[in-house]
UniProtKB/Swiss-Prot annotation:
The basal body constitutes a major portion of the flagellar organelle and consists of four rings (L,P,S, and M) mounted on a central rod. This is Flagellar L-ring protein. It is a lipid-anchor. Residues 1-21 form the signal peptide. The keyword Signal applies. Residues 36-46 have a biased composition (Pro residues). Keywords: Bacterial flagellum, Cell outer membrane, Lipoprotein, Membrane, Palmitate, Signal. Assembles around the rod to form the L-ring and probably protects the motor/basal body from shearing forces during rotation. It comes from Bordetella parapertussis (strain 12822 / ATCC BAA-587 / NCTC 13253).
Amino acid sequence: MMLKTVLRLPVCAALLALAAGCAMIPPEPVVTGPLTAPPPPPPQPSARPNGSIYQPSAYGNYPLFEDRRPRNVGDIVTIVLEEKTNAAKGVATNTSRDGSATLGVAAAPRFMDGVINDKLDTDISGGNTANGTGKSSANNTFTGTITTTVIGVLPNGNLQIAGEKQIAINRGSEYVRFSGVVDPRSITGSNTVSSTRVADARIEYRSKGVMDEVQTMGWLQRFFLIASPF
């Protein structure tokens, strides 16, 4: 009885390891790193007198005639998502090969009479033909808006931006993540910039919940899909 129990333990452990290997693997995120960068607390400035027309306290850190476009860590930038890609590819391959050979023997040994009729003529021919075609196409469209935060300023003045938007509806949730590098001169007066003008742009749109689970193949199906040789 003890021997049977000892033998069953490795089998159970192997089955558990196999089931764990077939478990659902979460997708790797496209956008990595911090998604927001709260600015450090500014030093306490000395009290400034307020005039009768212009009051500095009402404008925060922005002077009266300063451009309001983002330039510091912690400023926000609205990204207008305008991504559209179309790709198509076609491949065709045709190959053929023919060959032939003839072998003749004028006379054969007497003990083989009646079998090959005193003469051996052999013709060999062969052919090989292969045809292959393939086509692939992809169309993607992604539109919307997301407000990001400046998380860093490069030495040349370009801004590193990143942001995330999460939406939870009933039992499911969706999130959009964005990161990249933008030139401050590309930002419009309304504090927006098109995603097509962002360098090193990384856009991630995923969902969690019932709809995501429905679109995922079960672990047992994945096991048979991997183990099946066909």
